[in-house]
Amino acid sequence: SLNIIKMANVSISIAVLSTGNELKEPWQKASNEEIYNCNSFAIIAQLNEKGFNATYCGVIPDNLEKSIDFINSLKKYDVIITSGGISMGDADFMAEAFLKNGLEVAFHGVNVKPGRPIMMGKMDSSLVICLPGNPLTAMVNINLFVIPMLKKLQGENAFYHGYIKAINQSSFKTINGRVNIVLGRVQNGNFYVTDENKYGAGMITALYKSNSILVTNASTSNIESTQEVKILDLNVIYF
């Protein structure tokens, strides 16, 4: 009756940044004590692949006052995505800096391994998403939490993860009491766990070897060979 045929999707503006004095840009030279800022560019690549408009806004140093000022300059964006600075380290100022800018925290931390340090909330009209600093956990959280949320925020109808069923090909252990995120490859209906589920939170090679994620229940302590499992295909269409 309103003569509306189709709702238009809304293009949202997204700011992406990292934090840490130890970070160097890919075009800069890093010492043995420094690391390259791969998170921001990996996050932007993931978002661009999914059709989002993301802008790189730089690196915030580990300084509270500078963090507060930097964050205040980002309030023009619909979404602000950061990586690093939200753990319990002495130099992790991001949470406090956002709070000083009026952030209303929805949650801080999830019972997930890897990927526990994550914070989301609302700051004025901006949605704030703070991801872990470790590359593997940041990219896992982008796929699990962020992309579906952004799809919904942008007005898309399909934003739920699409799961497939596969047969696990080798047994491996998981941590009881936590929801475990297990990387692997799905091929011809079979799931092959990556590196026996033994890799660190900063090992981006595990991501390169994987095309899917197995999400366990918190009560699970091991996955048996030939067990049927539900898999999140990283290339699957959203529903």
Q: Which positions does each model-derived feature cover?
A:
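Generic structural signal for buried aliphatic residues
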Residues: 1, 80, 227-230
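Short beta-strand segments
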Residues: 16-19, 82-83, 111, 131-132
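Short, glycine/charged-enriched hinge/interface segments at domain edges or termini
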Residues: 1-56, 213, 233-237
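Residue-level signal for inorganic ion chemistry
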Residues: 16, 47, 81, 184, ...
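Flexible glycine/proline-rich
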Residues: 97-239
